[in-house]
Amino acid sequence: MIHEKSKLLKNLETAESLKLSPLPYHTSRLLELSDVSIAYGSRAVCSNISFTIEQGDRIALQGKNGSGKSSILKLICGENIPYQGILRKSERLKISYVPQSTAGLNGFLSEYIERNLLDESLFKAILRKFDFPREQFEKRLDEFSEGQKKKVLLAKSLCEQAHLYIWDEPLNYIDVLSRMQIENLLLEYKPTILFVEHDSAFCENIATKTVEL
């Protein structure tokens, strides 16, 4: 066990560190939810949720399965989620979103890059830092493992300059070394981020604030 940990730390030392370019915003408050409730038909998902996001916050959104965590993230990102209450978003707020599901990934990586207007060199460089073999770039996305698909979504977000990063279970299917790279990245660049993650150690290390649903 000690040998494995020592090997992992050595690998982390040799692994290239990830980079991020969070954008500053001209006011400290980016977003506010006041008494927000979400229901799908007669099924209530969450009720009377209130919190604010200030610049520099790293907020862990926590709650049981089915408590509305993903719905809150999607609502903030502008998806058509039925809700009551008040959601105030700062004007021209740029958000970078990593969804929980990888289901939408299809076609070739080159098509994904073009579709999302990504810098190809930067995007592929990030994937290489995530230990992607070069031959993987030529395969279809639906041939990727779940961990590789999640890395594609994370690499896209790391390419994007944003005021607010919203990540839904970013560590799902991710190997231990990449988890450590992601943790180091967030502690170094300190982006404003709202995230859902079941890894309690990650939440404890990263979050400056916790919101319970």
Residue map of PLM features:
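A short, surface-exposed alpha-helical micro-motif characterized by mixed small hydrophobic
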Residues: C203-N205
